[in-house]
Each structure stands twice: as C-alpha cells, then as structure tokens.
C-alpha cells in the first residue's frame, strides 16, 4: 500500500510557516504539585528525627 506524499515523517515547512502564533491563547500555568522549599524539607527532617 502506497501512502500519499502528504503522509511523510518530515514536517511540512509550508504548514509550519503559515502557523499563526497569535491564534494561541495565553494560559497561566499553575504547578499542580509544587516541590517543597528547603525550609519545609528541613522542618520535616527534624520532625521525623525527634
């Protein structure tokens, strides 16, 4: 079975060049699981030792 020329592994540069970034919406990224600060880690270590 022959695949049409449009189904290639190489990106279509014309398609990329006509992509309009202004159509993208700006979203605020929110960390779902923020890492604990060094202070929090130290407090937890000390709490675990006592």
Curated annotation (Swiss-Prot):
Q: Which UniProt keywords apply?
A: Acetylation, Actin-binding, Cytoplasm, Cytoskeleton, Isopeptide bond, Phosphoprotein, Ubl conjugation
Where in or outside the cell it occurs: the entry states:
Cytoplasm, Cytoskeleton
- Kindly give the CDD domains that the UniProt entry links to this protein: WH2_BetaT
Q: Where is this cross-link: Glycyl lysine isopeptide (Lys-Gly) (interchain with G-Cter in SUMO2)?
A: 18
Q: Which PROSITE patterns match?
A: THYMOSIN_B4 (PS00500)
In residue numbers, the region (Disordered) covers 1-50
Distribution of this protein across tissues and organs = Originally found in thymus but it is widely distributed in many tissues.
Residues spanning the signal sequence: none
Q: Which residues carry this modification: N6-acetyllysine?
A: 10, 18, 32, 38, 45
Q: Which residues carry this modification: Phosphoserine?
A: 8, 37
Annotated Gene Ontology cellular component terms: cytoskeleton; cytosol; nucleus
For this protein, the record's Pfam families field holds: Thymosin
Q: State any single GO MF term.
A: actin monomer binding
Q: What is its main location?
A: cytoplasm
Name the residue ranges with Basic and acidic residues bias. 9-31, 39-50
Which BP terms does GO give this entry? Answer: actin filament organization; positive regulation of DNA-templated transcription; positive regulation of smooth muscle cell differentiation; positive regulation of smooth muscle cell migration; regulation of cell migration
Record-annotated membrane-spanning stretches: none
Which InterPro entries does the record match to this protein?
Beta-thymosin, Beta-thymosin_sf
Q: Which residues carry this modification: Phosphothreonine?
A: 29, 40
**UniProt record similarity statement:** Belongs to the thymosin beta family.
Q: How does it assemble?
A: Identified in a complex composed of ACTA1, COBL, GSN AND TMSB4X. Interacts with SERPINB1.
What this chain does, per the entry, is described as: Plays an important role in the organization of the cytoskeleton. Binds to and sequesters actin monomers (G actin) and therefore inhibits actin polymerization.
Q: What protein name is recorded for this chain?
A: Thymosin beta-4
Q: Which organism is it from?
A: Mus musculus
Quick one: which gene encodes this?
Tmsb4x
